[in-house]
């Protein structure tokens, strides 16, 4: 087995107020002529996609828009967006939004060059050709989908989320302009911020972690601990929003290279079955999965180390679990899976599907089906 470790991030990333204009100038200087914007109805309604469209048109690009991406984007979203791209013969894709818009755009850009159906690329590095260049403008902090090689697409017929982990879907440019996040509602700030925290923690206890991903994960936790609640309480807090831009990007650097674990493996199934918000599912599951992970000595030690980054006086994994529950309560996250509408009769199939999700492969403990069901049950009854 090779001992070589790769580290994957976009070639270019822009941060700070004014990053939108910087990105538009960069696209013009590359001499592209036709762009497809992929976004969602909410971003279209507040005028942000129109603003980016105007910037690009002022720089002599012809712009088409697909703005029907739904939360937890599905195969139909990918197909419809690809149709718009082909009609215009777009050279590049510009995604605007959170994880849903970016994931849909990645899938569209991948199919534009590789052909076939998006399900053909489920798993790790199944494509042969580079996707069309993707410029990912982020509006949440967040999924980090604007900078990762992950894309998650729902197969509604099978009630599953397909995890496509492929170097070829890595965006060409990632854009984090905190001014696009000032209007983010508190509930979405909480859900996306806790998604970023889950990325940090799962990457830190991952079997594929390394010193670089560890540094990214721990710094991400520090920034989230300092700034997430502040951003939740005051969405226009410029420092908190800026810190969260960096935090979610650091989290992305961590999990893009160390991968994830059973929190995400289970959250994907909850999203596929019940169309629940991804970040909320992660937040509810995170303490329970990590508690189960403590049977692994290395994971237990690392969870103890994380406690120091939450302000504990000593390494204690129980303090980390406690801090996660407190953070959830502070930001009004549902207490358990029961409150989210999960059904007890689905526990078995949720567990089975999670055990086939690529994210479980780097969890520090390879649970039996009975253990996965027990985790779901605990998260349901808590």
Swiss-Prot record:
Keywords, comma-separated and alphabetical: Iron, Metal-binding, Mitochondrion, NAD, Oxidoreductase, Zinc
Cited InterPro entries: ADH_Fe/GldA, ADH_Fe_C, ADH_Fe_CS, Alcohol_dehydrogenase_Fe
Keyword flag Metal-binding: yes
Induction: Induced by transcription factor ZAP1 in response to zinc deficiency.
GO biological process assignments: amino acid catabolic process to alcohol via Ehrlich pathway; fermentation
Intracellular or extracellular location(s): Mitochondrion
pH dependence of this protein's activity: Optimum pH is 8.3.
Molecular functions per Gene Ontology: alcohol dehydrogenase (NAD+) activity; ethanol dehydrogenase (NAD+) activity; metal ion binding
Function: Alcohol dehydrogenase specific for ethanol. Acts mainyl as a mitochondrial formaldehyde dehydrogenase and has no effect on ethanol production. Shows drastically reduced activity towards primary alcohols from 4 carbon atoms upward. Isomers of aliphatic alcohol, as well as secondary alcohols and glycerol are not used at all. The role of ADH4 in yeast metabolism is not yet known, but ADH4 is not responsible for the production of ethanol during growth on glucose nor responsible for the oxidation of ethanol to acetaldehyde.
Protein name stated in the entry: Alcohol dehydrogenase 4
